[in-house]
Amino acid sequence: MTAPLTLALSKGRIFEETLPLLAAAGVQVTEDPETSRKLILPTTNPDLRVIIVRASDVPTYVEYGAADFGVAGKDVLVEHGGSGLYQPIDLNIARCRMSVAVSAGFDYASAVRQGARLRVATKYVETAREHFAAKGVHVDLIKLYGSMELAPLVGLADAIVDLVSSGGTLKANNLVEVEEIMAISSRLVVNQAALKLKRAALKPILDAFERASQNGG
């Protein structure tokens, strides 16, 4: 008996916005990860299962073959580096942007012009390092895992690098966006070995995902 294909997803927005793409492939996930304690979820296709992992872990599960394919944000993939992954499709879901933000009273442009060394809090350390290095801005990076908006408010950092959707959370915490680093959307990523060895099983699903993403779900 052939092992089922394994799709790695994270809870929340990416999971919810992937469901219509799965539906386009004729597949439904039969349990809700928000209410189920299970981390391996069956689908209506006996040859496909879904595993629920942290968003930042999706590329690792796919890279090492624990999952055949997955959906991950560009932010996560840039930090990961993309080793061992084939990235055939931008799914155009979970869209947002990665930006630099500061407290409303902080003159970021002036600090940069004067060559000030800035403390920047982020969980996207590699991306932030490359961005500021390319602009010639001197920074000390502080790795945080959440509540990024708090860092400037309590004097931990001069700026943050984080994902922004509507900007409502920034505004609520008296922060302003001063620089966009990149536009973010979620991509389909495929294990390179699986693409060769399981191509017949994978291709119909990948094709359905691509069609659905181009048609807006």
UniProtKB/Swiss-Prot annotation:
Major subcellular site: cytoplasm
GO function terms (MF aspect): ATP binding; ATP phosphoribosyltransferase activity
Gene3D superfamilies linked: Periplasmic binding protein-like II (3.40.190.10)
One of the record's GO cellular component terms: cytoplasm
Cellular localization per UniProt: Cytoplasm
Enzyme class per UniProt: transferase
Enzyme nomenclature, EC number: 2.4.2.17
Name of protein: ATP phosphoribosyltransferase
